[in-house]
A protein has these predicted regions:
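Bacterial N-terminal signal peptides that target proteins for export
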Residues: 1-13
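Flexible, solvent-exposed loop/hinge segments and secondary-structure transition points
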Residues: 24-163
């Protein structure tokens, strides 16, 4: 083997190793045990506090890793349609292991991002976040009732506090 071909082989192996490590670093968290009812009740508190601080009325849902409802709360004067939307956002974040804003951004980008529309259960609107404990997804939170950015702000407050 010549020096040139040896260097190419080493460069190829290094490129593959870097690409693989990048892909592994971006892999979503694995699923863990389901969030408890007590922890689900605690998880919604930062979202509700963020909404109250800003005079927003929201509905908040927490689901387990399989997308089953664990806890739900709706503030007074929240639009009625937000009840199911909050559950759908939470379920989407749990089942697809990512914030729902990722789908919103993919859809907004157009092109291949339009494939989001064919994913059953994917909600392309900000406001859903996985809940992570010890590096594992134990559930997800969904918020609806304000603008999608405001819903996301509330849900993120809960997801960040939950870690």
């Amino acid at each position: 083997m010549s020096l040139k071909s040896g260097l190419r082989a080493i460069a190829g192996v290094m490129f593959f190793a870097c690409a693989l490590s990048g892909a592994l670093a971006q892999m979503p968290n694995p699923y863990g045990l389901s969030i408890s009812l007590d922890n689900a009740k605690k998880a919604v508190l930062p979202a509700l506090a963020e909404a109250a601080k800003n005079n927003w009325s929201i509905a908040v849902a927490v689901v387990d890793p399989a997308g089953n409802l664990v806890y739900y709360e709706k503030m007074d004067n929240t639009q009625l349609g937000s009840a199911n939307v909050s559950i759908d956002k939470a379920r989407s974040a749990a089942l697809f292991k990512r914030p729902t804003k990722a789908f919103q951004d993919a859809l907004a980008a157009g092109g291949e991002g339009l494939r989001v529309l064919s994913l059953q259960g994917a909600v392309p609107v900000d406001g859903g976040f996985p809940l992570i404990s010890d590096g594992k997804i134990v559930g997800a939170i969904g918020v609806s009732g304000a603008t999608s950015a405001q819903d996301g702000q509330c849900a993120k407050a809960s997801a960040d506090a939950f870690k």
